[in-house]
């Protein structure tokens, strides 16, 4: 295998690992009920985007936004998350 292929494989692994860590931190922050209705999809410029599966779930996370933000900051302090953005969408497993 080439050095470039090895580097790309390592980068892909690192991205998958970061996605898994982000989702685990979200689940730990929001609890099992909300975790089953939502997925943390990305963190960009200090904003974590969370996809929720329904308008009911959107209302629930919106009502709990400040608490969820405090918890996710504790779970991922190195990410310096300053805001949560919620969107209704399809939850891909």
Locate predicted features.
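Short, non-transmembrane amphipathic alpha-helical segments
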Residues: 58-80
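N-terminal presequence-like segments and adjacent domain-start helices
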Residues: 1-28, 36-42, 78-93
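Single-stranded RNA-binding regions, centering on S1/OB-family and related RNA-binding modules
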Residues: 32
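A short interface-forming secondary-structure element
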Residues: 45-65
């Amino acid at each position: 295998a080439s050095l470039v292929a090895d580097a790309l494989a390592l980068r892909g692994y690192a991205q998958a690992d970061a996605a898994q860590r982000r989702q685990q931190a979200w689940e730990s922050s929001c609890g099992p009920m909300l975790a089953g209705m939502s997925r943390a999809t990305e963190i960009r410029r200090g904003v974590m985007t969370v996809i929720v599966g329904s308008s009911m779930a959107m209302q629930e996370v919106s009502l709990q936004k400040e608490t969820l933000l405090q918890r996710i900051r504790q779970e991922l302090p190195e990410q310096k998350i300053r805001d949560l953005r919620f969107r209704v969408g399809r939850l891909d497993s």
